[in-house]
């Protein structure tokens, strides 16, 4: 994640216009979420609570969002580590207040960030059935055993929105394909065991 720039710290100085520490605390909490950058209501609320124009409020929200995300990304949970991010000439009381607020909320923010990260689909259920597949033509009649494998897969909830996030995939496997698949899965299991034992 990109480091903070001088412009970010200049924008953070707008918090000095807040009427109370609670206003600063509320803005820090609301600016952590990724949706804050597109929220017109939060922008309007920031303008009115700090008595600043929209451009300045937008820069402040972006700087606060970037700052809180950077702290969570780097897993900085001590006041000393957070204070070290500020430039020397930054307002001392504001620096201490922001650090205190971040230390109070960092564990919640990290949990929120981890819960909202995009992940790969996960296998939630597996079922199979062995069938005899028959085919015939004028020359011969064949009976071939096949495996019908059904996997239930859960998509990342953040990508699905309102739609159900579990889908089923059914595939037909011949004995040869199943042997190849089991051999590959056996090698994967061995590699996982080797990594786990290190």
UniProtKB/Swiss-Prot annotation:
<dbReference type="GO" id="GO:0006814">
    <property type="term" value="P:sodium ion transport"/>
</dbReference>
<dbReference type="Pfam" id="PF20923">
    <property type="entry name" value="COMMD9_HN"/>
</dbReference>
<comment type="similarity">
    <text>Belongs to the COMM domain-containing protein 9 family.</text>
</comment>
<dbReference type="GO" id="GO:0042632">
    <property type="term" value="P:cholesterol homeostasis"/>
</dbReference>
<keyword id="KW-0915">Sodium</keyword>
<dbReference type="InterPro" id="IPR017920">
    <property type="entry name" value="COMM"/>
</dbReference>
<feature type="modified residue" description="N-acetylalanine">
    <location>
        <position position="2"/>
    </location>
</feature>
<dbReference type="InterPro" id="IPR048676">
    <property type="entry name" value="COMMD9_N"/>
</dbReference>
<dbReference type="Pfam" id="PF07258">
    <property type="entry name" value="COMM_domain"/>
</dbReference>
<dbReference type="InterPro" id="IPR037360">
    <property type="entry name" value="COMMD9"/>
</dbReference>
<feature type="domain" description="COMM">
    <location>
        <begin position="122"/>
        <end position="196"/>
    </location>
</feature>
<keyword id="KW-0804">Transcription</keyword>
<keyword id="KW-0968">Cytoplasmic vesicle</keyword>
<keyword id="KW-0539">Nucleus</keyword>
<keyword id="KW-0805">Transcription regulation</keyword>
<comment type="function">
    <text>Scaffold protein in the commander complex that is essential for endosomal recycling of transmembrane cargos; the commander complex is composed of the CCC subcomplex and the retriever subcomplex. May modulate activity of cullin-RING E3 ubiquitin ligase (CRL) complexes. May down-regulate activation of NF-kappa-B. Modulates Na(+) transport in epithelial cells by regulation of apical cell surface expression of amiloride-sensitive sodium channel (ENaC) subunits.</text>
</comment>
<keyword id="KW-0739">Sodium transport</keyword>
<protein>
    <recommendedName>
        <fullName>COMM domain-containing protein 9</fullName>
    </recommendedName>
</protein>
<comment type="subunit">
    <text>Component of the commander complex consisting of the CCC subcomplex and the retriever subcomplex. Component of the CCC (COMMD/CCDC22/CCDC93) subcomplex consisting of COMMD1, COMMD2, COMMD3, COMMD4, COMMD5, COMMD6, COMMD7, COMMD8, COMMD9, COMMD10, CCDC22 and CCDC93; within the complex forms a heterodimer with COMMD7. Interacts with RELB and NFKB1/p105. Interacts with CCDC22, CCDC93, SCNN1B, CUL1.</text>
</comment>
<keyword id="KW-0007">Acetylation</keyword>
<dbReference type="GO" id="GO:0005829">
    <property type="term" value="C:cytosol"/>
</dbReference>
<keyword id="KW-0406">Ion transport</keyword>
<keyword id="KW-0833">Ubl conjugation pathway</keyword>
<keyword id="KW-0813">Transport</keyword>
<dbReference type="GO" id="GO:0005794">
    <property type="term" value="C:Golgi apparatus"/>
</dbReference>
<dbReference type="GO" id="GO:0031410">
    <property type="term" value="C:cytoplasmic vesicle"/>
</dbReference>
<dbReference type="GO" id="GO:0005654">
    <property type="term" value="C:nucleoplasm"/>
</dbReference>
